[in-house]
Amino acid sequence: MSRVGKLPIEIPVGVEVCVNGRTVSITGPKGSLYLDIAEQIGVSVSDGKVLVSRSDDSRTARALHGLTRALIANNVHGVLHGYTKTLEIVGTGYRVSKKGENLELALGFSHPVFVDPVPGVSFGVEGNSKIIVSGIDKQAVGEAAASIRKLSKPEPYKGKGIRYSDEIVRRKVGKAGK
């Protein structure tokens, strides 16, 4: 048995989980998410818990067992509490501002960079150097934050660029002068 997959998922008050064929729909106070289930995996809801099972012990079924359980648990947490990622902008002249739903970033290029939010993800700005990416889908929030970070990764000599708030940038020593 998968150690992760065999654990039941508690359904909190205010969250509803429905299984329709190969689709699991999870609805909560912040919204609803849908998850397609693989053929080898079975999902059942009984007395306030979600149980994930598998049909056989093949390698793919074992892998999908734990994955499916983790995805359902993430969706249950997302529709109840939501997910946020915080990014910081470090560097002279580097700043961010919000134009409607979009972000406008000044990253040292000759032009501003605009970032459109993906569906289900919203952007927030604190000051002119902090970006807050939030939403109910953990994967969408992580991908949106990673795509913003990718625009200007933190460089190791001065540390300027876009970084996660909890990220530690390894610094290198510059070349020694004479």
Swiss-Prot record:
Concerning InterPro entries, the annotation shows: Ribosomal_uL6-like (IPR000702), Ribosomal_uL6-like_a/b-dom_sf (IPR036789), Ribosomal_uL6_a/b-dom (IPR020040), Ribosomal_uL6_bac-type (IPR019906), Ribosomal_uL6_CS (IPR002358)
GO function terms (MF aspect): rRNA binding; structural constituent of ribosome
Alphabetical GO CC annotations of the entry are: cytosolic large ribosomal subunit
- Keyword set for this entry? Ribonucleoprotein, Ribosomal protein, RNA-binding, rRNA-binding
The lineage's top-level taxon is Bacteria
> One biological process GO term for this chain?
cytoplasmic translation
Which HAMAP family does this one have?
Answer: Ribosomal_uL6_B (MF_01365_B)
Job of this protein: This protein binds to the 23S rRNA, and is important in its secondary structure. It is located near the subunit interface in the base of the L7/L12 stalk, and near the tRNA binding site of the peptidyltransferase center.
Q: How does it assemble?
A: Part of the 50S ribosomal subunit.
Protein name as it appears in the record: Large ribosomal subunit protein uL6
Q: Which organism is it from?
A: Tropheryma whipplei (strain Twist)
Q: Which gene name does the record give?
A: rplF
